Amino acid sequence: MAGRHPVEEAFLAGRRALRLLVTPGRRDALERLVLHATTLRIPVVEIEGGSLTAVTGFDGHQGVALVAAARAPAAPADILARAIEQGEAALVLALDSLEDPQNVGTLLRSAEAAGVHGVVFPTRRQAPLSPAAIKASAGATEHLLLAPVDDLPGTLADMHVRGLRVVGTDAGASLTYREADLQGPLVIVIGSEGRGLAPAVRRRCDLLVRIPMRGRIGSLNAAVAGSVLLFEAAAQRGPGPARAGGQPNQTS
C-alpha cells in the first residue's frame, strides 16, 4: 500500500508490516511514520521516487509505501456477525462490477465513515483493490471487512433470506432516496459506472431509489451516488458511536 494515510491506518490497525519504503527527499516530512516503524523494529528502506512508482504501480505514493502481510478476505457471514457484535442493524455496501479504482476507493472511504459493517464485491469484472484504490480510500480498507464473492446475485439473495433488504439505485425509480426507509438491516448496491446494475443484480433488489437532479447533468458518478445513499442511511439510523477524527481532509 502507498500514501501517507493508508500507511498510517495500517499501523493503527495493527497490520503486520515487513518494511517501510520512503523516498530520501520526503523522509523529513514522513518523520512520524519513520519513527513509528523504527519503534516497531520495521526496517526502513530508502528508495528513489521513480523506483517507488515502479514498485507500487502508480505515482500518487507521496513518497511512502508499506510492504505488509496480506489480509485474509472476509466472508459475508463475517460482516453480519460484526453487526451483531456491535448491537447494530447490519449495513452492507455491495459493489456491482465497478471499473474505476478511484470510485472504489472513494466508496470504501465513505462506507467506513458512514458506519458500514462490511463490503461485498465480485471476484471478477471488478476494479481491484490496487494501491490507487487503497490511497483513494484514505486507509479505510484497514478498518472494513472486505468480502469478495464469486456470485454477487446469489450473495444478495442469501442476505435477503437472512433479513436484509437490498436497495439499488435507478434513475427511473419512482421513489427518491429521501422517501425510502433505509433503517433496519440493509444492503446498498452500487452499479458500475457505465452500465449501472446488472440485470441479475437488479432482480435481487427489494427496492430501487433515485437521487433527484436539479441541474442539467442527468446523473452522479458511482462514488458520489453511493456516498449520498450511505449517509442517508446513516442519518436515518441516528448517531453512532463517537470516533476519533471525523473532519474532512483535503490533502488526502
Where are these regions (language model features)?
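RNA substrate-binding interface of SAM-dependent RNA methyltransferases
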Residues: 8, 12-16, 27, 32, ...
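N-terminal positively charged helical leader segments and presequences
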Residues: 1-86, 245-252
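Active-site/ligand-binding-proximal alpha/beta "capping" segment
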Residues: 167-217, 221-223
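Structured adenosyl-cofactor binding patch, chiefly the S-adenosyl-L-methionine
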Residues: 13, 113, 118, 128-140, ...
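Active-site helix-initiating loop/hinge in glycosyltransferases
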Residues: 3, 103, 219-221
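Short beta->alpha connector loops at strand-helix junctions that form conserved
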Residues: 48, 69, 96, 122-123, ...
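Short basic, glycine-rich beta-strand/loop surfaces that mediate nucleic-acid
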Residues: 55-70, 137-140, 183-191
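Short glycine-rich anion-binding loops that position phosphate/pyrophosphate groups of nucleotides
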Residues: 26, 52, 70-72, 98-100, ...
